Amino acid sequence: MACCTGRCTLILLCTLQLVAALERQVFDFLGYQWGPILANFLHIVVTILGLFGTLQYRPRYVIAYAIWAAIWVTWNVFLICFYLEVGDLNKESDLLSFHVSQHQSWWSEHGPGCVRKEAPVAGVAGLESHSYVSVIGCSVEYQYIEVMHSALQILLALLGFVYACYVTSVFTEEEDSFDFIGGFDPFPLYHVNEKSNHLLVKQTSLPA
């Protein structure tokens, strides 16, 4: 079957999602954001599964991808709420790092136009250096960069969900029509062989 519009579009969407997820994974690793790192890893795995299912006409894999797309949208909505401090959420907390470290988003110190300055702490001596870090001159605050990342992920996931449902319905209809004409039904072949054997036995039993 030629590559239909819906199937080709889903392949393109899965590819774009992989590129966006890998880009995001790199910066989450740099910021030690363990929660997003784990979520990105699962997203990459399931997206590859969905891409494989689309290429190999496996509707179950595409369905699994569609279910994950809905979960992925929910996760990114949470991230938007987190960075915009909706309700009791605080973007300065270490929630996304699983309270393992005090690291924040990598963009908080390395965003566009940001200048990072370190001031040593007075009266603190030791082998480890201690300093206050201040960031000034950022063209875009880091929370808005993270929100834009999540918004892009939501857009791609919603489109992927819609096309995954469409492609699944197309695959299912094709399987049903193939079953209807006996494509996967072993009975016709068995029936022909049984009839041939019956005729052979009948011929050998005739008197000479």
Curated annotation (Swiss-Prot):
It is found in: Cell membrane. It is a multi-pass membrane protein. The keyword Membrane applies. The chain crosses the membrane at residues 10-30, 35-55, 62-82, 151-171. Keywords: Cell membrane, Membrane, Transmembrane, Transmembrane helix. The keyword Ubl conjugation does not apply. GO terms for biological process: regulation of sodium ion transport. It comes from the Eukaryota. One of its GO terms (cellular component) is plasma membrane. Interacts with atp1b1 C-terminus. Belongs to the NKAIN family. This is Sodium/potassium-transporting ATPase subunit beta-1-interacting protein 4. The gene is nkain4.
